[in-house]
């Protein structure tokens, strides 16, 4: 029992003396993180297919509107990709960007500058129909996509 009391007395003496004996130490470090650029494009209102009527064929074109939600975290903006599907159209006119675009069979990429955030993108498309097109339902002749810069 005497040994236990001595051990407790020693521990108490060290515990109360420790702050007086302890030196002050400081440390600093830098933390950095790399956040990969990310873009998501969601169709809010876009037809799943293109319905071409006899009046559209006679007129030579048909029009649709589409609305998308674009969310990105890049400080410089994002890249909007417009990828036409061949065969149904001669050209596609795209309105709703900084300028009206007219595209043929080749894809177009458009830099969309702006701060990070979530934005609504409203586009209008005029599809100039190929002369061989007949009335009917077709897959949408344009794929809209977005990716980081």
Model regions and ranges:
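Bacterial N-terminal signal peptides
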Residues: 6-17
């Amino acid at each position: 029992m005497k040994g236990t009391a001595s051990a407790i007395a020693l521990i108490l003496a060290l515990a109360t003396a420790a702050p007086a004996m302890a030196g002050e130490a400081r440390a600093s470090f830098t933390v950095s993180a790399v956040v990969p650029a990310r873009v998501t494009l969601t169709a809010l209102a876009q037809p799943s297919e293109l319905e071409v009527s006899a009046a559209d064929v006679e007129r030579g074109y048909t029009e649709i509107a589409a609305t998308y939600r674009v969310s990105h975290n890049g400080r410089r903006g994002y890249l909007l990709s417009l990828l036409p599907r061949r065969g149904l159209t001669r050209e596609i006119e795209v309105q709703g960007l900084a300028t009206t675009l007219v595209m043929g069979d080749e894809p177009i990429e458009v830099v969309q500058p702006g701060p990070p955030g979530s934005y609504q993108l409203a586009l209008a498309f005029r599809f100039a129909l190929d002369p061989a097109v007949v009335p009917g339902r077709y897959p949408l002749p344009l794929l809209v996509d977005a990716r980081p810069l």
